[in-house]
């Protein structure tokens, strides 16, 4: 027996962002809190069009633009205060995974009338309805626009940072607006990292112990689209093109060590690749909500929290190592993944892992954590966090603590051959 629950209405297609205002008006919204990141989102044409549309419809709005990468629980609480102080009655999350996760947390906090920290890492469940929430992703990676999950950073009294995932049916946005045109300005390095994030979601959910025929369908279609379009979305027409360094070095570690081609304008071909990636991320999000995730995320969360490596990039680096370790336990399903990713038949589990690693190398993903400049001093803390990862039970292999330590050692300085 299995269940399938995915209540988010999805509107997908070029230009569909124009549907946002009429749809949120149908929800009875009169004053909207728009949650975005601190970066260039607010200066984007898509954001300006959204605000103009709300103004024209007579819907008031308040902009909360204090969301950093992997939002801290204190940021969520601050957003909830802004919502209450301005008597808002709906929320729009506009941007990448962090602003949308923050919007989810704000909605849940408003519904419960309590700080989000009361629910993160405590086991306490949400029980009360939330305000109308619309998610508008501008990156193709997390799929959070359709998931029941959100990830927040907790900073304790010692300054120790840890990322904790939470899940609830109340996190599902009421509406997801997935417009590939909003993704066209993503630089190649961000496209690469977020694209591999989506691939990680699809693969981990597909090999999960809790996979179902329905989740499999979503995950495999996501893998197919990523396999045929991620290189092109990064501006790479051939493997040899992946030579120009377009790294974006910043505090978030979003592009640390990432190389990819120039995105250029690309015309129709680039838009089609972006559309494939946008849909793939959404499909993978549906899949992971049904089947869960595994030890790639078990390691990626502490790597991101402690070393400042962007979540998508951390997943991209760690994915082939974990899948290599799963060959004895999930070989048949990895072969199926390999066939979907490459479009070829008769792929062995080993060839599938090499195909995953090759895709990462082609778009400039570093081959290990050392190459991504993750300091060795974080090793023990990363391991301790991974050992306590609550989703270990979804892994098709019941890793021992010693196996996870050996795996992390390999992630630091090893290499998955391609």
Predicted regions and their residues:
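ATP/NTP phosphate-donor binding region
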Residues: 1-90, 369-370, 398
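Short glycine/serine/threonine-rich phosphate/pyrophosphate-binding segments
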Residues: 17-20, 43-46, 73-75, 98-103, ...
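Glycine/threonine-rich beta-strand-loop-alpha-helix active-site module
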Residues: 74-181
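Carboxylate- and glycine-rich phosphate/diphosphate-binding segment that chelates Mg2+/Mn2+
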Residues: 149-291, 402
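Short alpha-helical scaffolding segments that buttress acidic/His motifs in well-ordered protein cores
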Residues: 199-203, 277-285, 299, 319, ...
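C-terminal catalytic subdomain
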Residues: 291-348
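C-terminal charged capping/lid subdomain of soluble metabolic enzymes
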Residues: 334, 341-418
């Amino acid at each position: 027996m299995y269940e399938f629950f995915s209540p988010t209405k999805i509107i997908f297609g070029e230009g569909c962002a124009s549907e946002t205002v009429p749809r949120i008006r149908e929800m009875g919204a009169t004053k909207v809190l728009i949650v975005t990141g601190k970066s260039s989102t607010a200066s984007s044409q898509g954001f300006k069009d959204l605000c103009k549309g709300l103004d024209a419809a007579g819907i008031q709005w308040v902009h909360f633009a204090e969301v950093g990468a992997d939002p801290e629980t204190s940021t969520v609480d601050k957003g909830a205060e802004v919502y209450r102080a301005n008597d808002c009655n709906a929320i729009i999350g506009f941007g990448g995974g962090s602003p949308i996760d923050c919007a989810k947390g704000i909605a849940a906090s408003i519904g419960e009338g309590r700080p989000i920290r009361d629910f993160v890492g405590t086991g306490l469940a949400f029980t009360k309805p939330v305000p109308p929430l619309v998610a508008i992703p501008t990156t193709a990676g997390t799929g959070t626009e359709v998931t029941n999950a959100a990830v927040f950073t907790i900073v304790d009294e010692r300054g120790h940072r840890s990322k904790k995932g939470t899940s609830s049916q109340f996190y599902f946005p009421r509406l997801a607006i997935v417009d590939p045109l909003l993704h066209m300005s993503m630089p190649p390095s961000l496209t690469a990292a977020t694209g591999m994030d989506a691939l990680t979601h699809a693969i981990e959910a597909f090999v999960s112990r809790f996979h179902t025929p329905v989740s499999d369908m979503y995950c495999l279609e996501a893998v197919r689209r990523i396999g045929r379009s991620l290189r092109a979305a990064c501006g790479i027409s051939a493997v040899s093109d992946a030579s120009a360094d377009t790294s974006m070095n910043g505090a978030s570690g979003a592009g640390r060590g990432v190389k990819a081609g120039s995105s250029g304008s690309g015309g129709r071909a680039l838009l089609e690749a972006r559309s494939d990636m946008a849909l793939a991320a959404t499909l993978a999000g549906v899949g992971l909500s049904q089947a869960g995730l595994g030890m790639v995320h078990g390691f990626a969360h502490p790597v991101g929290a402690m070393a400042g490596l962007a979540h998508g990039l951390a997943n991209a680096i760690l994915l082939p190592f974990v899948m290599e370790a799963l060959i004895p336990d999930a070989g048949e399903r990895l072969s199926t993944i390999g066939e979907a990713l490459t479009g070829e038949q008769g792929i062995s589990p080993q060839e599938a892992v090499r195909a995953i690693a090759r895709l990462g190398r082609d778009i400039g993903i570093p081959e290990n954590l050392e190459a991504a400049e993750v300091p060795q001093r974080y090793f023990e803390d990363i391991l301790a966090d991974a050992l306590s990862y609550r989703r270990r039970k979804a892994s098709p292999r019941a890793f021992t603590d010693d196996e996870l330590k050996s795996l992390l050692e390999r992630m630091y300085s090893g290499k998955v051959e391609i």
